UniProtKB/Swiss-Prot annotation:
Belongs to the MurCDEF family. One of its GO terms (molecular function) is ATP binding. GO terms for biological process: cell division; cell wall organization; peptidoglycan biosynthetic process; regulation of cell shape. This is UDP-N-acetylmuramate--L-alanine ligase. Transmembrane segments: none annotated.
Length: 481
């Protein structure tokens, strides 16, 4: 295998992307196309929302994976980290031919190395925070490109904002320590707790990964961190003793300084809050106090880049930021509103960890106190479910009705028989009075057609494929009108 590299100038370079339909890969394709690269790709035949993005870009996508997809002799191959040559003939052929290859995290690292780069990290909250920053970049006319891990609302289904090339801002993922390929000048750290149990053997293991990520900051690099999160406080304490040269900027309700948060409550489907260092109120149009914390982290980074580009922060800059937050509608699969029909509000959220589930449901309960909340949850990965079984069972307290399914398996793990969806169902029944189990997602359709009524909020939760249930039910009730 020949480790490839991406030069700062990719204009005219032929880049083939294996697994191009993934959210991150398609976003990277858009970024590379905008910089003049000749991009092609390959993937499975299944249709995803990223197909529309790739078609709009004019990127040829070949299906299925095949050695023939390399016939155009690409200069570089970038592949999703989900694929390895032992299981993907196309990637194995690229290795055999000696074509320079690199993974998606490695490609992101090369891009970050050539620019003033900022990484957004955290077990929870990094996607929404990055999406908020993307909209701020547009409104503030910052000379920056932003790569988000999901399609941003109001951004033409796209996961990227291309506003310039001085700054590069990206969502960076902790899974398998992928973010250690990134070269940040600034980091926003939203949350840290044990997750990805198929890779991280313990909480201490994932804590160490985040410590090493912070340690990649250069001398006098900036760390914006959510001091309300216990895991963040612990990793920052470790970093502070070994890296006293860094600039530490806390944000949250516990924070001192400019980004100390006071939350005032929900008003007209917006949460009002204020920051210690700024006059007046801010509003965020997403449910949950965690949305306020995400907004504050985004504000802190955006204002630091405003100072770097413009030399000062003006009233106009703050007005623009207030506007972004008040109008921000989230991103795909993050408290995403699918629509309302017959008085039933349909939503979808990617929350697949007990902490995320609890925060999401509590936020929805506060935002929509008059609605009954009906949740369909599909747990993702056997290892995560086994490790957090009790926590999952206790995470639905703010739901009125709960539907569970068989666990959505990860391609990267083998089921060992230790836990399944019925185990989660039996334990959840002890904690909640209305819990139902349907092994397959679509088996729940008749029950939900009869159960849902005017005034309900139906939300699909999880990283599985149960999100399709919302669309099926929405269309059913639409036809019934």
């Amino acid at each position: 295998m020949k480790r490839g590299t991406l030069p700062k100038d990719v204009s005219g370079i032929k880049i083939h992307m294996i697994g191009i339909k993934g959210t991150g890969m398609s976003a990277l394709a858009e970024l590379l196309c905008a910089r003049g690269a000749r991009v092609s790709g390959s993937d499975v035949a299944d249709v995803f929302y990223t197909d529309r993005i790739l078609a709009r870009l004019g990127v040829p996508v070949r299906t299925p994976f095949s050695c023939q997809n390399l016939a155009d002799a690409p200069d570089v191959v970038i592949h999703s980290a989900a694929y390895v040559p032992e299981e993907n003939d196309e990637l194995a052929e690229a290795y055999r031919r000696g074509i320079p290859t690199l993974t998606y995290p490695e490609a992101l690292g090369d891009i970050s190395c050539a620019r003033f780069s900022c990484g957004i990290a955290g077990v929870h909250g990094k996607t929404t925070t990055t999406a908020m920053i993307a909209q701020m970049v547009k409104e503030l006319r910052l000379d920056a490109s932003v790569l988000v891990g999901s399609a941003v609302s109001g951004n033409n289904d796209s996961c990227v904002v291309l506003n310039g090339d001085t700054f590069f801002i990206a969502e960076t993922c902790e899974y398998r320590r992928h973010f250690l390929h990134f070269h940040p000048q600034k980091i926003v750290l939203t949350s840290v707790e044990h997750d990805h149990q198929d890779y991280y053997s313990s909480y201490e293991d994932i804590l160490a990964a985040y410590f090493h990520y912070i340690d990649r900051l250069p001398q006098f690099g900036e760390l914006f961190y959510c001091v309300d999160d216990q895991g963040v406080r612990e990793v920052v304490q470790l970093a502070f003793f070994s890296r006293p040269d860094l600039v530490y900027v806390p944000y949250g309700e516990r924070a001192w300084g400019d980004y100390g948060v006071s939350i005032h409550g929900v008003q007209d489907r917006k949460i009002s809050f204020s920051l210690r260092g700024f006059a007046g109120e801010f509003y965020v149009a997403l449910p949950g106090e965690h949305s306020v914390l995400n907004a504050t982290g985004a504000l802190a980074l955006a204002l630091s880049l405003v100072k770097k580009q413009y030399g000062e922060v003006t009233v106009e800059h703050l007005t623009a930021l207030r506007k972004v937050l008040a109008l921000f509608q989230g991103c795909r699969r993050r408290s995403e509103v699918l629509g309302e029909v017959r008085g039933i509000l349909f939503m979808d959220d990617y929350g697949h960890h007990p902490t995320a589930i609890k925060k999401t449901l509590r936020g929805l309960k506060t935002f929509f106190p008059e609605r009954r909340i009906v949740v369909d949850f599909m747990s993702h990965t056997y290892s995560r479910t086994a490790a957090l079984l009790t926590e999952f069972a206790e995470s639905f307290q703010d739901a009125d009705v709960v539907i569970l399914h068989e666990i959505y398996a990860s391609a990267r793990e083998v089921y060992q028989g230790e836990v399944n969806g019925e185990h989660l169902f039996e334990l959840t029944k002890r904690k909640h009075r209305r819990v139902y189990y349907y092994e397959a997602v679509m088996q729940a359709v008749p029950f939900l057609q009869a159960e849902l009524k005017e005034g309900d909020l139906f939300v699909t939760l999880g990283a599985g494929d149960n999100c399709k249930l919302g669309e099926v039910l929405f269309n059913y009730f639409k036809e019934e009108v």
